[in-house]
Amino acid sequence: MKIQILCFTTLFLAIVTSQVTTAYKFKFDYFGNGTDLISFHGDAEYGPDTDGMSRSGAIALTRDNIPYSHGRAILTTPITFKPNASALYPFKTSFTFSITPKTNPNQGHGLAFIVVPSNQNDAGSGLGYLSLLNRTNNGNPNNHLFAVEFDVFQDKSLGDMNDNHVGIDINSVDSVVSVKSGYWVMTRNGWLFKELKLSSGDRYKAWIEYNNNYKVISVTIGFAHLKKPNRPLIEAKFDLSKVIHEQMYTGFAGSMGRGVERHEIWDWTFQN
């Protein structure tokens, strides 16, 4: 399937209900003190600091000492994405992440933001499946999976374009759209693309938005300490109302192969 490319120390959680809409808005500034609002599956955990004793303030989706480690961190409460069976609320999310290889050159595999029908990890496996799906269910339209992957290993059997890309996944880890990781800046001569190495260990910020009127998914990434780039990395037209149920769970998933790599989420906001 292809789609058209359109060229908490502090935790705040609010649920606003009216006859017209149900809105969810939350913000995790960091995850150092833990919270029962996040459920962990597989090898995911509150990340250890470099001393191995204290917490880093991040969610770790994989563990350094477990080969082929993979896991999910999911919000325990489902989010209402639809007021009825057909319509879909617009939504936007942003988060800071880092991918840090511990062995070279065998890094892998990556992490993803996910919207899934269950807060369990019974369908996910490691390696290129990123703890999203597995060999058996990959591509099944009944998965009702929406994900944005940040992939650092080229798995040609799964259609990966290179070892440093961002992709939109619909019911499959074979991305419907994928592009080289990076961001756009405006110069005197027009737009200039600058590549970002996802597995550099640097902290990057990702912004993911869905416009329900135009059925457009946009993905933007940049350095965490800089403002959001004005031009999205990806703008793709797809009707997510056919994928997302009225209530879904959201969170993150990640995996690695033989190469040891740390996949961490440092903060997270969501609003619909």
Features from the language model and the residues they span:
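Polar, low-complexity loop segments and adjacent catalytic/binding residues used for recognizing
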Residues: 2-272
